[in-house]
Amino acid sequence: MSYDLALGYLVSQNKQYGLKAIEILNAWAKELQSADTHQSEDNINFYMPYMNMAYWFVKKVFPSPEYEDFIKRMCQYSQSALNTNHGAWGILFDISSALVLGDHALLHNSANRWQEWIFKAIDENGVIASAITRSDTSDYHGGPTKGIKGIAYTNFALLALTISGELLFENGYDLWGSGAGQRLSIAYDKVATWILNPETFPYFQPNLIGVHNNAYFIILAKHYSSPSADELLKQGDLHEDGFRLKLRSF
Protein backbone atom coordinates (compact mmCIF):
# COMPACT_ATOMS: atom_id res chain seq x y z
CA MET A 1 0.00 0.00 0.00
CA SER A 2 2.83 2.43 0.79
CA TYR A 3 4.18 1.98 -2.75
CA ASP A 4 0.84 2.81 -4.37
CA LEU A 5 0.33 5.83 -2.12
CA ALA A 6 3.84 7.10 -2.77
CA LEU A 7 3.43 6.60 -6.50
CA GLY A 8 0.12 8.46 -6.29
CA TYR A 9 1.94 11.33 -4.62
CA LEU A 10 4.69 11.28 -7.24
CA VAL A 11 2.17 11.50 -10.06
CA SER A 12 -0.34 13.92 -8.51
CA GLN A 13 1.74 15.84 -5.94
CA ASN A 14 -1.20 15.37 -3.57
CA LYS A 15 0.48 15.65 -0.18
CA GLN A 16 -2.15 13.51 1.51
CA TYR A 17 -0.87 10.51 -0.42
CA GLY A 18 2.70 11.27 0.56
CA LEU A 19 1.81 11.79 4.21
CA LYS A 20 -0.07 8.50 4.38
CA ALA A 21 2.79 6.65 2.67
CA ILE A 22 5.38 7.95 5.12
CA GLU A 23 3.04 7.21 8.02
CA ILE A 24 2.91 3.55 6.98
CA LEU A 25 6.66 3.36 6.43
CA ASN A 26 7.40 4.95 9.79
CA ALA A 27 5.03 2.52 11.49
CA TRP A 28 7.03 -0.38 10.08
CA ALA A 29 10.24 1.30 11.16
CA LYS A 30 8.93 1.61 14.70
CA GLU A 31 7.41 -1.86 15.07
CA LEU A 32 9.81 -4.18 13.23
CA GLN A 33 13.16 -4.40 14.97
CA SER A 34 14.38 -7.78 13.72
CA ALA A 35 13.35 -10.95 11.89
CA ASP A 36 12.87 -14.00 14.09
CA THR A 37 11.95 -16.68 11.53
CA HIS A 38 13.08 -17.77 8.09
CA GLN A 39 9.71 -16.71 6.68
CA SER A 40 10.01 -13.22 8.14
CA GLU A 41 13.51 -12.94 6.67
CA ASP A 42 12.10 -13.95 3.28
CA ASN A 43 9.32 -11.39 3.59
CA ILE A 44 11.82 -8.63 4.32
CA ASN A 45 13.89 -9.67 1.31
CA PHE A 46 10.88 -9.66 -1.02
CA TYR A 47 8.91 -6.64 0.25
CA MET A 48 11.55 -4.12 1.28
CA PRO A 49 12.19 -3.13 -2.37
CA TYR A 50 8.60 -1.87 -2.62
CA MET A 51 8.90 0.01 0.67
CA ASN A 52 12.27 1.48 -0.19
CA MET A 53 11.05 2.71 -3.54
CA ALA A 54 7.97 4.18 -1.88
CA TYR A 55 10.29 6.13 0.40
CA TRP A 56 12.41 7.18 -2.57
CA PHE A 57 9.31 8.73 -4.17
CA VAL A 58 8.50 10.87 -1.12
CA LYS A 59 11.89 11.37 0.54
CA LYS A 60 12.55 14.85 -0.82
CA VAL A 61 9.42 16.32 0.76
CA PHE A 62 8.93 13.85 3.62
CA PRO A 63 12.41 12.78 4.80
CA SER A 64 12.45 10.21 7.60
CA PRO A 65 15.65 9.43 9.51
CA GLU A 66 13.63 6.76 11.32
CA TYR A 67 12.88 4.91 8.10
CA GLU A 68 16.47 5.24 6.92
CA ASP A 69 17.66 3.70 10.20
CA PHE A 70 15.13 0.93 9.61
CA ILE A 71 16.66 0.19 6.21
CA LYS A 72 20.09 -0.07 7.79
CA ARG A 73 18.76 -2.59 10.32
CA MET A 74 17.00 -4.65 7.68
CA CYS A 75 19.88 -4.80 5.19
CA GLN A 76 21.34 -7.75 7.09
CA TYR A 77 18.41 -9.84 5.83
CA SER A 78 19.14 -9.27 2.16
CA GLN A 79 19.55 -12.60 0.36
CA SER A 80 21.49 -11.12 -2.54
CA ALA A 81 24.30 -13.66 -2.13
CA LEU A 82 22.03 -16.51 -3.27
CA ASN A 83 21.88 -17.57 -6.92
CA THR A 84 18.12 -18.15 -6.79
CA ASN A 85 15.01 -15.99 -7.07
CA HIS A 86 15.69 -15.00 -3.46
CA GLY A 87 19.04 -13.67 -4.60
CA ALA A 88 17.54 -11.74 -7.51
CA TRP A 89 15.15 -10.00 -5.14
CA GLY A 90 17.97 -9.47 -2.65
CA ILE A 91 19.88 -7.58 -5.33
CA LEU A 92 16.85 -5.35 -5.86
CA PHE A 93 16.63 -4.89 -2.08
CA ASP A 94 20.28 -3.82 -2.04
CA ILE A 95 19.90 -1.44 -4.98
CA SER A 96 16.80 0.24 -3.58
CA SER A 97 18.53 0.57 -0.21
CA ALA A 98 21.61 2.07 -1.84
CA LEU A 99 19.55 4.65 -3.70
CA VAL A 100 17.59 5.92 -0.72
CA LEU A 101 20.64 5.91 1.56
CA GLY A 102 22.99 7.43 -1.00
CA ASP A 103 25.33 4.47 -0.53
CA HIS A 104 27.48 4.59 -3.67
CA ALA A 105 29.63 1.62 -2.66
CA LEU A 106 26.58 -0.60 -2.21
CA LEU A 107 25.18 0.53 -5.55
CA HIS A 108 28.49 -0.25 -7.28
CA ASN A 109 28.71 -3.66 -5.63
CA SER A 110 25.10 -4.38 -6.56
CA ALA A 111 25.80 -3.57 -10.21
CA ASN A 112 28.58 -6.15 -10.16
CA ARG A 113 26.40 -8.67 -8.34
CA TRP A 114 23.57 -8.18 -10.85
CA GLN A 115 25.93 -9.26 -13.62
CA GLU A 116 27.37 -12.11 -11.58
CA TRP A 117 23.91 -13.47 -10.70
CA ILE A 118 22.88 -13.53 -14.35
CA PHE A 119 25.96 -15.47 -15.45
CA LYS A 120 25.64 -17.94 -12.58
CA ALA A 121 21.88 -18.50 -12.66
CA ILE A 122 20.94 -18.12 -16.34
CA ASP A 123 22.48 -20.55 -18.80
CA GLU A 124 23.53 -19.78 -22.38
CA ASN A 125 20.08 -20.79 -23.61
CA GLY A 126 18.36 -18.29 -21.33
CA VAL A 127 17.09 -20.87 -18.85
CA ILE A 128 17.09 -20.38 -15.07
CA ALA A 129 17.61 -23.97 -13.96
CA SER A 130 16.71 -23.24 -10.33
CA ALA A 131 13.33 -21.89 -11.43
CA ILE A 132 11.95 -24.12 -14.17
CA THR A 133 11.53 -27.24 -12.02
CA ARG A 134 9.42 -25.59 -9.30
CA SER A 135 6.38 -27.61 -8.27
CA ASP A 136 3.37 -26.69 -6.14
CA THR A 137 4.12 -29.24 -3.41
CA SER A 138 6.52 -29.45 -0.48
CA ASP A 139 8.84 -31.30 -2.86
CA TYR A 140 9.83 -27.96 -4.34
CA HIS A 141 11.69 -29.30 -7.38
CA GLY A 142 10.05 -32.68 -7.86
CA GLY A 143 6.93 -34.74 -7.43
CA PRO A 144 3.99 -35.20 -9.80
CA THR A 145 3.73 -31.47 -10.56
CA LYS A 146 7.42 -30.79 -11.14
CA GLY A 147 7.69 -27.63 -13.22
CA ILE A 148 4.08 -26.49 -12.84
CA LYS A 149 5.38 -23.23 -11.37
CA GLY A 150 8.48 -23.13 -13.54
CA ILE A 151 7.39 -20.24 -15.74
CA ALA A 152 6.01 -18.39 -12.72
CA TYR A 153 9.32 -18.58 -10.87
CA THR A 154 11.22 -17.62 -13.99
CA ASN A 155 9.00 -14.57 -14.28
CA PHE A 156 9.47 -13.80 -10.59
CA ALA A 157 13.25 -13.76 -10.86
CA LEU A 158 13.27 -11.82 -14.12
CA LEU A 159 10.95 -9.19 -12.66
CA ALA A 160 13.47 -8.39 -9.93
CA LEU A 161 16.38 -8.40 -12.39
CA THR A 162 14.50 -6.11 -14.75
CA ILE A 163 13.59 -3.51 -12.12
CA SER A 164 17.16 -3.69 -10.82
CA GLY A 165 18.58 -3.23 -14.30
CA GLU A 166 16.44 -0.17 -14.96
CA LEU A 167 17.24 1.43 -11.61
CA LEU A 168 20.94 0.87 -12.28
CA PHE A 169 20.53 2.27 -15.80
CA GLU A 170 18.93 5.46 -14.47
CA ASN A 171 21.65 5.88 -11.89
CA GLY A 172 24.80 5.62 -13.95
CA TYR A 173 25.16 1.89 -14.66
CA ASP A 174 24.03 1.03 -18.17
CA LEU A 175 24.33 -2.75 -18.18
CA TRP A 176 21.67 -3.55 -20.77
CA GLY A 177 24.28 -3.99 -23.50
CA SER A 178 26.83 -5.78 -21.31
CA GLY A 179 27.53 -9.48 -21.54
CA ALA A 180 25.15 -10.06 -18.65
CA GLY A 181 22.58 -7.87 -20.34
CA GLN A 182 22.82 -9.94 -23.50
CA ARG A 183 22.33 -13.11 -21.45
CA LEU A 184 19.24 -11.49 -19.91
CA SER A 185 17.91 -10.70 -23.39
CA ILE A 186 18.16 -14.40 -24.26
CA ALA A 187 16.20 -15.27 -21.12
CA TYR A 188 13.61 -12.65 -22.07
CA ASP A 189 13.07 -14.20 -25.48
CA LYS A 190 13.09 -17.72 -24.02
CA VAL A 191 10.39 -17.08 -21.44
CA ALA A 192 8.37 -15.09 -23.97
CA THR A 193 8.42 -18.10 -26.28
CA TRP A 194 7.24 -20.35 -23.43
CA ILE A 195 4.42 -17.96 -22.54
CA LEU A 196 3.27 -17.59 -26.12
CA ASN A 197 3.59 -21.33 -26.79
CA PRO A 198 3.41 -23.14 -23.42
CA GLU A 199 3.79 -26.55 -25.02
CA THR A 200 7.43 -25.65 -25.74
CA PHE A 201 8.15 -25.37 -22.01
CA PRO A 202 10.22 -28.40 -20.88
CA TYR A 203 7.78 -29.19 -18.06
CA PHE A 204 4.59 -28.41 -19.94
CA GLN A 205 1.48 -29.80 -18.24
CA PRO A 206 -2.14 -28.77 -17.82
CA ASN A 207 -2.79 -25.82 -15.51
CA LEU A 208 0.66 -24.26 -15.52
CA ILE A 209 0.72 -21.54 -12.85
CA GLY A 210 1.71 -17.89 -13.27
CA VAL A 211 2.38 -18.08 -16.99
CA HIS A 212 1.34 -14.49 -17.71
CA ASN A 213 3.07 -12.87 -14.72
CA ASN A 214 5.12 -10.83 -17.16
CA ALA A 215 4.29 -7.14 -16.78
CA TYR A 216 8.04 -6.55 -16.57
CA PHE A 217 8.17 -7.09 -20.35
CA ILE A 218 7.13 -3.42 -20.57
CA ILE A 219 10.64 -2.45 -19.47
CA LEU A 220 12.61 -5.13 -21.30
CA ALA A 221 10.92 -4.22 -24.58
CA LYS A 222 12.60 -0.80 -24.32
CA HIS A 223 16.01 -2.44 -24.49
CA TYR A 224 15.68 -5.76 -26.33
CA SER A 225 13.96 -7.21 -29.36
CA SER A 226 11.82 -10.34 -29.12
CA PRO A 227 9.04 -11.10 -31.61
CA SER A 228 7.36 -13.42 -29.09
CA ALA A 229 7.45 -10.75 -26.38
CA ASP A 230 6.17 -8.12 -28.82
CA GLU A 231 3.18 -10.33 -29.59
CA LEU A 232 2.46 -10.81 -25.88
CA LEU A 233 2.70 -7.07 -25.25
CA LYS A 234 0.29 -6.50 -28.12
CA GLN A 235 -2.15 -8.99 -26.56
CA GLY A 236 -1.88 -7.08 -23.28
CA ASP A 237 -2.47 -10.00 -20.91
CA LEU A 238 0.22 -8.86 -18.45
CA HIS A 239 -0.01 -9.72 -14.75
CA GLU A 240 2.00 -9.33 -11.52
CA ASP A 241 2.31 -5.58 -11.95
CA GLY A 242 3.12 -4.69 -8.36
CA PHE A 243 5.41 -1.90 -9.54
CA ARG A 244 2.56 -0.45 -11.69
CA LEU A 245 4.60 -0.58 -14.86
CA LYS A 246 1.46 -0.17 -16.94
CA LEU A 247 0.93 3.26 -15.39
CA ARG A 248 4.43 4.66 -15.40
CA SER A 249 7.92 4.23 -16.82
CA PHE A 250 11.12 4.45 -14.81
Locate each region found by the language model.
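Aromatic-lined, polymer-binding surfaces characteristic
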Residues: M1-G172
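Short, charged, amphipathic alpha-helical segments
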Residues: I22, S178-Q182
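Short, solvent-exposed helix-helix connector turns and helix-capping sites enriched
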Residues: D103, G181, S225-A229
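Intrinsically disordered or highly flexible coil/loop and linker segments, enriched in small
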Residues: D123, N197-F201
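Terminal, non-catalytic domain-edge segments
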Residues: I163, L167, N171, I186-K190, ...
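Short conserved catalytic/interaction loops centered on acidic-Pro-aromatic/His motifs
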Residues: G172-S178
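Acidic helix/loop microenvironments that form the catalytic cleft of cell-wall polysaccharide enzymes
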Residues: Q182-L196
